[in-house]
Design a protein with these regions (language model features):
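N-terminal secretory signal peptides that target proteins for export/translocation
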Residues: 1-14
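Bacterial N-terminal signal peptides
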Residues: 17-29
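Central antiparallel beta-sheet cores of small beta-barrel/beta-sandwich binding domains
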Residues: 40-138, 144-153
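Structural recognition of the beta-strand scaffold that forms the well-ordered cores
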Residues: 187-193, 222-228, 264-269, 299-304, ...
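Aromatic-lined carbohydrate-binding/catalytic grooves of carbohydrate-active enzymes
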Residues: 195, 205, 209-313
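Glycan-recognition surfaces
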Residues: 288, 331, 335-430, 451
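Carbohydrate-binding surface patches
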Residues: 418-421, 426-428, 464-503, 534
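C-terminal beta-strand-rich structural cap/linker in extracellular carbohydrate-active enzymes
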Residues: 522-545
Length: 545
């Protein structure tokens, strides 16, 4: 049975190249392989005697000067062909099957159920198949791949089994507690490139976002980090130092520019051999890369698990050790660098993330710009809210506000919920083209104040009836923030009784609507109002004087 794996060349929801499409994250055990290709085999085979059994590699050049290599394995029995797309997101590949007719092979993957937290899909929802049309040409395979209605093409050549394997396992360090770096005592606020730009991000784009962060008023509202996500990397030089690709000719100069705007600069890497998009990562070079990041002026590191999953089993102990290694390295640089753990909530990271030196940790799979994704992720966070404390935050992923996939009411719910959760507020839209409505949501000072409250107290569930929920969070000044949420598809009444709010039931002061920016008159034993579809009413109840 084939259980070997190779480098992952896919990134969440991105299908702009064949390498990304081939290795879309549909995880299953690959079929058995009857025979392995001999190393270097490249003989031309006639259609009548073609034998596709073996390992294949697709190398796709990109404008940034990098190549992404995607691997797959095939087994041929007569005209029937089975195999697997190999990736580094798990110890298994994605099964494919098809029939060879002359020189043409039609391969498909079976539609698979999405795991909980998968971007844009509900747990158990079917993911679309990958369709690969293959033509034999002089011992090579010309591929045309379609996934999520996107089609692209490339040529694959034979390779060896060894080429598909991850590098040898480096022993992990013994566990210990990394000292607190005393950073981000309230949740970090900023911007990240991935949600809007993904692999297209360039030096010029980042400079433009820094400019817009200031000119739009975002910086004044508290957003300070400008974070470059994946696809800036190239390779390593003769001394093992990580280098940047053509899109980022001088990373230190870019960081200096961001700093000149009064902002802070963030970067991305992975503990595996490659990042989620298939670029050079920090495996075996943690201390060296941390020093490089510090020398460039990096203030924030997002560290994405990605290909490390194929080297180390994802036990809580292994995950903690993986992230501890970079946590130690960052602190040894002497530069204050916010440490963002991104391992999708595996191993109950909220229980040990702070021990690695982490300041924030992703608690779920990737978010997407759709109500179902945001709703599922956001409302799943209440139970783990007690794990937050100053400098250490649950991270339900970046904000999608302004990207166009949700209504204004849904975006207000997004902002309200993340703020009640004391989640990092990392915008993911194009800051240059924000509408007034988007600005009013992202820069609502009264809502931001909820997120940034210094008490760092957890949110609590007050009431849950059908598709409506009432959440409550105490503030440092003695006030209480109450969120009335309607998760249903129709407008609905949502309310609470004062007796459900222990800190406010005896008597209370002014009640303020944080979205309407006006006081609300409440009399009697409680409050109820009609909340629009997927909407929210966010109230701040002052303590009585």
């Amino acid at each position: 049975m084939i259980a070997d794996v190779a480098r992952l060349m896919a990134r969440k929801g991105s299908a702009r190249s064949l390498s990304l499409l081939l290795l879309a994250a549909l995880l299953a055990t690959p079929p058995a392989v009857r025979a392995e290709a001999a190393p270097g085999q490249a003989a031309t085979q006639a259609a009548s005697s073609a034998n596709l059994t073996g390992y294949w590699v697709l190398r796709v050049p990109h404008d940034d000067g990098t190549f992404r290599s995607s691997y797959f394995q095939l087994e041929q029995s007569g005209d029937a062909v089975t195999g697997a797309l190999l990736n580094n997101s798990s110890a298994n590949g994605t099964p494919v099957s098809g029939t060879l007719v002359g020189k043409h092979l039609h391969l498909t993957t079976a539609a698979a159920s999405s795991p909980a937290g998968a971007a844009g899909t509900a747990a158990g929802a079917p993911r679309p198949s990958i369709v690969i049309e293959v033509t034999l040409e002089d011992g090579k395979l010309s591929l045309q791949t379609t996934y999520r209605q996107r089609t692209t093409a490339g040529v694959a050549e034979r390779t060896t089994r060894e080429a598909t394997l991850p590098p040898p396992m480096i022993p992990l360090p013994a566990l210990h507690d990394v000292a607190d770096n005393n950073l981000v005592r309230t949740p970090p606020m900023g911007w990240n490139s991935w949600n809007k730009f993904a692999g297209r991000i360039t030096d010029a784009d980042v400079r433009a976002m820094a400019d817009a962060m200031v000119s739009s008023g975002m910086a004044k509202a508290g957003y300070v980090y400008i974070n470059v996500d994946d696809t800036w990397e190239l390779d390593r030089d003769a001394n093992g130092n990580i280098t940047t690709n053509k899109k980022f000719p001088d990373m230190k100069a870019l960081a200096d520019y961001v700093h000149s705007k009064g902002l802070k600069f963030g970067l991305y890497s992975s503990p595996g051999p490659t990042t989620c998009a298939g670029y050079m990562a920090s495996y075996g070079h943690e201390a060296q890369d941390a020093k490089t990041f510090a020398s460039w002026g990096v203030d924030y590191l997002k560290y994405d698990l990605c290909s490390a999953r194929t080297i180390y089993p994802s036990t809580p102990e292994n995950l903690q050790a993986i992230y501890q290694k970079m946590g130690d390295a960052l602190q040894q640089t002497g530069r204050p660098i916010v440490y963002s753990l991104c391992e999708y909530g595996q191993g109950d990271v909220w229980k040990w993330g702070a021990k690695t030196g982490g300041n924030l940790w992703r608690t779920t799979g990737d978010i997407s710009d759709h109500w179902a994704s945001m709703d599922r992720i956001g409302f799943s966070q209440v139970d783990i809210s007690p794990y937050i404390r100053a400098g250490h935050w649950n991270d339900p992923d970046m904000l999608e506000i302004g990207n166009g996939g949700m209504t204004a009411d849904e975006y207000r719910t997004h902002m309200s919920l993340w703020s009640m959760l004391a989640a990092p507020l990392i915008a993911g839209n194009d800051l240059r083209t924000m509408t007034d409505e988007t600005k009013s949501i992202l820069m609502n000072a009264e809502v931001i104040a909820v997120d940034q409250d210094p008490a760092a107290k957890p949110v609590e569930m007050v009431a849950h009836e059908g598709t409506t929920e009432v959440l409550m969070r105490p503030m440092a000044d003695g006030s209480v923030v109450i969120g009335l949420y309607n998760r249903g598809s129709e407008a609905a009444p949502v309310g609470f009784q004062w007796k459900q709010i222990p800190s406010a039931q005896a008597k209370h002061g002014t009640v303020r609507d944080l979205w309407k920016h006006e006081d609300v008159k409440i009399s009697g034993n409680g409050y109820s109002t009609t909340v629009p579809t997927h909407g929210v009413v966010l109230l701040r109840v002052a303590s009585a004087k």
